[in-house]
């Protein structure tokens, strides 16, 4: 039983780490491409900024979904019922 709980905690930690890493890489690429495109065509900066914020919200959703799944596995572990 303790092995299942330990493996679940480790798995949830890895899930959160990869979600945070993916979100950070996504924000870095998004910011770099936004600055590059704004420097190339300054008249489109306001339109690009709106689209950038929409994509940034979707990138944040990845981390929030990972938090939700991790909390599900930690507090309402579906694998403990398989042991009985």
Swiss-Prot record:
Residues spanning the membrane: 9-29, 54-74
An example Gene Ontology molecular-function term: lipid binding
Record keywords: ATP synthesis, Cell inner membrane, Cell membrane, CF(0), Hydrogen ion transport, Ion transport, Lipid-binding, Membrane, Transmembrane, Transmembrane helix, Transport
Site (Reversibly protonated during proton transport): 60
Membrane topology classification: Multi-pass membrane protein
Keyword set includes Thylakoid: no
Entry GO CC: plasma membrane; proton-transporting ATP synthase complex; proton-transporting two-sector ATPase complex, proton-transporting domain
Signal peptide: none
Intracellular or extracellular location(s): Cell inner membrane
Pfam families, alphabetized: ATP-synt_C
InterPro entries xrefs: ATP_synth_csu_bac/chlpt (IPR005953), ATP_synth_F0_csu (IPR000454), ATP_synth_F0_csu_DDCD_BS (IPR020537), ATP_synth_F0_csu_sf (IPR038662), ATPase_proteolipid_c-like_dom (IPR002379), F/V-ATP_Csub_sf (IPR035921)
Keyword presence, Cell inner membrane: yes
General function of this protein: F(1)F(0) ATP synthase produces ATP from ADP in the presence of a proton or sodium gradient. F-type ATPases consist of two structural domains, F(1) containing the extramembraneous catalytic core and F(0) containing the membrane proton channel, linked together by a central stalk and a peripheral stalk. During catalysis, ATP synthesis in the catalytic domain of F(1) is coupled via a rotary mechanism of the central stalk subunits to proton translocation.
Similarity field: Belongs to the ATPase C chain family.
Assembly information from the UniProt record: F-type ATPases have 2 components, F(1) - the catalytic core - and F(0) - the membrane proton channel. F(1) has five subunits: alpha(3), beta(3), gamma(1), delta(1), epsilon(1). F(0) has three main subunits: a(1), b(2) and c(10-14). The alpha and beta chains form an alternating ring which encloses part of the gamma chain. F(1) is attached to F(0) by a central stalk formed by the gamma and epsilon chains, while a peripheral stalk is formed by the delta and b chains.
Protein name: ATP synthase subunit c
